[in-house]
Amino acid sequence: MRILVVSNLYPPVAFGGYEVECSGVVERLRERNDVLVLTSDEHGRSTPAQPGVRRELVRLSHDARGARRAPLASLRAVASARRALAWGAELIYVWNGSSIPQAALRVLADSDVPLAFRICEHWFGGIFLNDQFMRELLPASRPPARAAWAAGCRALNSLPSLRLDPGAPMRTAISWNSAAIRSMVRVQPFIEPVLERVGHSVPRYGDLYAAVVREPAPEPEIVFLGRVTLYKGLWVAIEALALLRSEYGIQARLVVVGPEDADHGADMRDLAERLGVGEAISWRGQATPEQAAAALARAHALIVSSEWDEPFPLVTIEGALARVPLVASDVGGIGEGMHDEEHALLFPRGDTGAAAAALVRVLREEQQTTARVERAFERAQAFRLGPYLDEQERFVVDALAALTSEPLTSA
């Protein structure tokens, strides 16, 4: 089978674990199929050319600059999509359509090629309608300047090479990465899912984390493993650390492992200094999986303090495989993967006091913590790479079968 995979990013260019997950699925599919990847040109000139990967789509920022670039980027994206269709795909599998011109996805959806989606994030709820170009094609009350811009977008869309309809009907198959994201995303009425499945995401390097030999640091060490950006809630971990030291007399340290959004990283350092814990925090920056595993080997706890509704964060599974006690926000799909009290201690979103109290329990209730860690390790076995890749392979085959069957019609 010839499969066209579309994603906003593709390794070695990656923002998080989902892009790495995508590349694992592509590698598996290539064992029995021809696969072409269409992705963004992010870091395109510095990224080595890869067989079967086209880095052609413009990656758009979610701001005024991105909106200004969107019309011409959409024109280019449509041309890229049509070139990809000329390759002769028998199935299109869209992995992540966020931050790329969704005009490309609209062209693919309007073709006769069966179309499936892997949904790991919230973007699918606003597909086409929130796109920075196609949203201007919809009727709406706009201020004068915005109305003029929308008129220009509609004029561009009148070109024979475009003529896109954001709300045109679309039959598809959907693989959701958690029941949580399935419940959080509203599927637009013009979309007809003919097949839906929940297939939980899994860590690409699960075996590496499962092989971690625990050597906890002499003093309590808490690890935050993730991007230093607003929605990941590092401030919760920093304030919880301050409470551990000031209210509970626990001289813990916080190890921050992950790439930083520069401005937010500076804000977090300022917060740590104001709270008097600046010297108790180590900033490790971007890490390889091996370096992350080494940090987990020393950790007394892993804190996942996200403020947004994480669909299914892989870091919780990685920590469980490494046998590190988990303290996490009760948001999105976190509790779907690791159940409260049974596998982890969950706290309400943004509640620094509850986060600190959960960390105290982990550090002081040795027997309960040990038992919880063992249960979490067993739970994490449900999220291993081999069975997941088998499941994705079955989904692709079943999606093609469902989408090529005749649609039901009313009598």
Regions found by a protein language model. Give the residues of each.
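Acidic donor-binding loop of glycosyltransferase active sites
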Residues: 297-311, 324
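Conserved acidic donor-binding segment of nucleotide-sugar-dependent glycosyltransferases
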Residues: 340-341, 345-352, 361-367
